[in-house]
Amino acid sequence: MAYRKLGRNTGHRGSMLRNLATSLLKHERIQTTEARAKEVNAIAEKMITLGKQGDLAARRNALTYLLEEDVVTKLFTEIAPKYADRQGGYTRVIKVGPRRGDAAEMVLIELV
């Protein structure tokens, strides 16, 4: 299986990952579970690569996935130019220990 189901049906999982990707690009750092971070990591990498292309078609593709237009603008004007000379590896995942309620492994995912 090429992806994690994360205990959700298809629509809920897709919405959750879109929200996480939008939040990560907006705040440049979020705290979530390890499984969610691994999934959103791939999405964020693809969005930043789209931002590096910089053309109108790439912007429209990013708009279909990210939920906020100002986040897409930030992606294309601030985030993507920062990684112009970097070939992938735009995010970093740092373990922060188990969550108090259910001992789920929590991580901090941030843009490098």
Swiss-Prot record:
Kindly state one GO CC term assigned in the UniProt record. cytosolic large ribosomal subunit
Record's InterPro entries? Ribosomal_bL17 (IPR000456), Ribosomal_bL17_CS (IPR047859), Ribosomal_bL17_sf (IPR036373)
Q: State the UniProt keywords alphabetically.
A: Ribonucleoprotein, Ribosomal protein
From the UniProt record, which GO molecular function terms apply?
structural constituent of ribosome
Q: Which GO terms describe its biological process?
A: translation
Q: Can the keyword Ribonucleoprotein be found in this entry's annotation?
A: yes
Q: Which cysteines link up through disulfide bonds?
A: none
Superkingdom of origin organism: Bacteria
Subunit: Part of the 50S ribosomal subunit. Contacts protein L32.
Q: Which family does it belong to?
A: Belongs to the bacterial ribosomal protein bL17 family.
List the protein's name.
Answer: Large ribosomal subunit protein bL17
Q: Which organism is it from?
A: Desulfitobacterium hafniense (strain Y51)
